[in-house]
C-alpha cells in the first residue's frame, strides 16, 4: 500500500514511487495527467483529528514522476466540511460500510479536470476544487452542511430544467422521479460533452441504512449535467433503479466508451446472481436506447471493472 508502480504490457515494473518515504499511504486511485504529473489519493500517516485519533482517506498529493518529489498536496479537511459527520450506531444494518469519525470523507476517486481537481468522497459527495484548495462546487444532499458551504452546493433541476423546490429532495430525505443525489458513490467520470457519469451505490439512500440483502435497494449509473455559472445540476439519464439484483453497497465503477458512446455499469459486490450466490456484474448499455448490449455475472466481489484496449496507444 505504500508504493505506486508503473508496469508495462509484459508485467515488468518500469518505475515506482515509495509513498511511505514521503509520509503517505496509497489508496483507491493514481492517475497521470496531461501535465505529466502523478495525482494520487492518499492517507497522510501523521494526520489526526483534534482528539488525536488517526484520520484516513482524506489527502491528495501531486508527484513529479521523474524526481519523485511532491509538487503539491491537499488536505480535504481544509476543503470540505469535516464536521459533517453523523455517528453510526454499530448495531444498525450496513454499519460496517458507514462513516466513522476518522473516516469522515472516504475519498475514493481523483483526476484532473483541466487545471482543477475532480474528486469523490463517499460520505461527502462529488466535487471539484481549484489548485489553491478553493471549492468550485459540490454534488451532494444539502443536509448537515455548515452555512459557509451553501454557495458551493449545486441546486437540483427537474428534467425540464426547472429548479426543484421540495426541501426533502434538496436535503436528500426523499428522491424525485426526475432527480436523486449519488449515495456512497464511486468512480465519477468526465464525459466528452462535459457531463459527469457516476456510480451511485445507493448506500443509505435517503439516510436509511439497511442490510445489503434487504429488498428495495438499488445502485445506478447516472449522468449529470453541471452548470457552473448558475450552480445547478440536472440528472440527464440513469439506469439501475429497476435492477435490485445489481445493488452494491460499496466498491464498483462506471466507464464511458467513446468508440460506441456506450457505458459500462459494474456493480462489484453483493449482487444476487442467477445461481443464488452473490458477486458482481459487468453490463454494457447503450444510453440512447437503454439496450443492454452485454451482461456478465462475476462470481466474486471486485473493486472496479475497466475495458482496456488490447495494446497501448501508439503500438
Residue ranges of model-derived segments:
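Histidine-/acidic-rich catalytic cores in large beta-rich domains
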Residues: 1-315
Amino acid at each position: 500500500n505504500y508504493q505506486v508502480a508503473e508496469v508495462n504490457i509484459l508485467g515488468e515494473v518500469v518505475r515506482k514511487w515509495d509513498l511511505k518515504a514521503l509520509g503517505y499511504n496509497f489508496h483507491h486511485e493514481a492517475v497521470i495527467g496531461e501535465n505529466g504529473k502523478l495525482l494520487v489519493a492518499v492517507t497522510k500517516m501523521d494526520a489526526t483529528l483534534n482528539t488525536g485519533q488517526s484520520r484516513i482517506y482524506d489527502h491528495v498529493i501531486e508527484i513529479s514522476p521523474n524526481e519523485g518529489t511532491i509538487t503539491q498536496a491537499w488536505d480535504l479537511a481544509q476543503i470540505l466540511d469535516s464536521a459533517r459527520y453523523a455517528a453510526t450506531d454499530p448495531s444498525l444494518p450496513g454499519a460496517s460500510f458507514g462513516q466513522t469519525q476518522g473516516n469522515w470523507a472516504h475519498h475514493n476517486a481523483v483526476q484532473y479536470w483541466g487545471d482543477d481537481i475532480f474528486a469523490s468522497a463517499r460520505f461527502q459527495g462529488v466535487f471539484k476544487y481549484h489548485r489553491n484548495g478553493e471549492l468550485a462546487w459540490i454534488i451532494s444532499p444539502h443536509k448537515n452542511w455548515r452555512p459557509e458551504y451553501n454557495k458551493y452546493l449545486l441546486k437540483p433541476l427537474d428534467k425540464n430544467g426547472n429548479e426543484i423546490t421540495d426541501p426533502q429532495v434538496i436535503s436528500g430525505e426523499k428522491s424525485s422521479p426526475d432527480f436523486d443525489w449519488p449515495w456512497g458513490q464511486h468512480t465519477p467520470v468526465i464525459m466528452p460533452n462535459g457531463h459527469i457519469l457516476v456510480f451511485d451505490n445507493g448506500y443509505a439512500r435517503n439516510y436509511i441504512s439497511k442490510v445489503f440483502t434487504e429488498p428495495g435497494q438499488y445502485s445506478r449509473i447516472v449522468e449529470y449535467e453541471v452548470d457552473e455559472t448558475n450552480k445547478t445540476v440536472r440528472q440527464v439519464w440513469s439506469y439501475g433503479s429497476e435492477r435490485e439484483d445489481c445493488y452494491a453497497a460499496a466498491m464498483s465503477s462506471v466507464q464511458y466508451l467513446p468508440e460506441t458512446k456506450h457505458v459500462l455499469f459494474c456493480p462489484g459486490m453483493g449482487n444476487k446472481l442467477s445461481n443464488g450466490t452473490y458477486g458482481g456484474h459487468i453490463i454494457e448499455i447503450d444510453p440512447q436506447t437503454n439496450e443492454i448490449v452485454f451482461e456478465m455475472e462475476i462470481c466474486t466481489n471486485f473493486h472496479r471493472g475497466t475495458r482496456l484496449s488490447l495494446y497501448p496507444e501508439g503500438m
